[in-house]
Amino acid sequence: MNIFDRKINFDALLKFSHITPSTQQHLKKVYASFALCMFVAAAGAYVHMVTHFIQAGLLSALGSLILMIWLMATPHSHETEQKRLGLLAGFAFLTGVGLGPALEFCIAVNPSILPTAFMGTAMIFTCFTLSALYARRRSYLFLGGILMSALSLLLLSSLGNVFFGSIWLFQANLYVGLVVMCGFVLFDTQLIIEKAEHGDQDYIWHCIDLFLDFITVFRKLMMILAMNEKDKKKEKK
């Protein structure tokens, strides 16, 4: 039999029999909201780079934090759904604005870094998401404690590096942080499934978890590529 004559059963590939239909519908809403966030964040980054709207990174970070707290404090219901979607869009927009300075830095180093970092992040996110979806339920939830501990250590080392100013420690934080955030994609995806299976239908808040995972992976990968490119330019001189 010629292997090239075989037909691929895409329905079988996309069949998640271990996930209930209601949870699958919930995941569709989560990823639809995630796509909306990506579009709005891209618009926010573009607006910053063209108009330098809200130039101070602190203001955009503070604004996104306020919107996140507001969203968290607003209960999920049919009556508040439109309001919470608006808050989600505002949060995504300001997050995109906050990415502006990092994007400008990478463009100054090498404009090709941006599409490379985005495509790399998309591939990483897709692969780890599919791994979490196809894996046995709760198989990655044990990572929660490990990931939170690693995140705490990264935060402490980042604060310590403010005083030490070590480039080696900064680079180590980038690489280790990238690995940790890949783990969070696995953990958060399976946690969302478990929450949905137990009746938590707040797809807007679940979307924020995945959106922040994607943005953090993108930011770290972008900075790693930019630093590597700068090192290459130094070696050529």
Swiss-Prot record:
It comes from the Eukaryota. Residues 1-29, 74-86, 134-139, 188-206, 228-237 are cytoplasmic. GO terms for biological process: autophagy; cellular response to unfolded protein; endoplasmic reticulum calcium ion homeostasis; negative regulation of apoptotic process; negative regulation of apoptotic signaling pathway; negative regulation of calcium ion transport into cytosol; negative regulation of endoplasmic reticulum stress-induced intrinsic apoptotic signaling pathway; negative regulation of hypoxia-induced intrinsic apoptotic signaling pathway. The chain crosses the membrane at residues 30-50, 53-73, 87-107, 113-133, 140-160, 167-187. There is a cross-link at residue 7 (Glycyl lysine isopeptide (Lys-Gly) (interchain with G-Cter in ubiquitin)). Disulfide bonds: none annotated. The intra-membrane loop at the C-terminus acts as a calcium pore, mediating calcium leak from the ER into the cytosol. This is Bax inhibitor 1.
